[in-house]
């Protein structure tokens, strides 16, 4: 039996601290959390009578991305305020096994990916933001999992092969202005206020 196990706990955050007073031409608060990973396992078993082989690829990931302007802050920027949280996770997981036996051959594989992603962009309670030209609060999450399993078995009397691929994905993506916060964009050429969230998981 061959096993490959990967555990990832990755946190990225960017913020303007509680109670801060910030002025300037522009303000960008950006958290960008990007992870690419590959987990692979291969097994080979051979025996004169019985050949058994197994391979398991297990990946456990926690991805946390946070961008925010804190509580009771005062922010003023003539040409815009951007609060951006972006999470991008790509996982490749493969497992393969071959069992060869004179009488019985068996090959079994399993590939499992467990992913929890939390992405948030926000203005916290009682934050006052004058973005001048614009206020843009955006949270986006892209989760892309590609896995493969291959099993083979050769036996003079009996052969058995089996593959299992499992994805457990839990994602939460939020963009918001908390209660009692204030957002404004008032210049003559103002683009306005945008609060957007997107979550994409190709399967």
Where are these regions (language model features)?
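Low-complexity, glycine- and small/polar-enriched segments
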Residues: 1-203
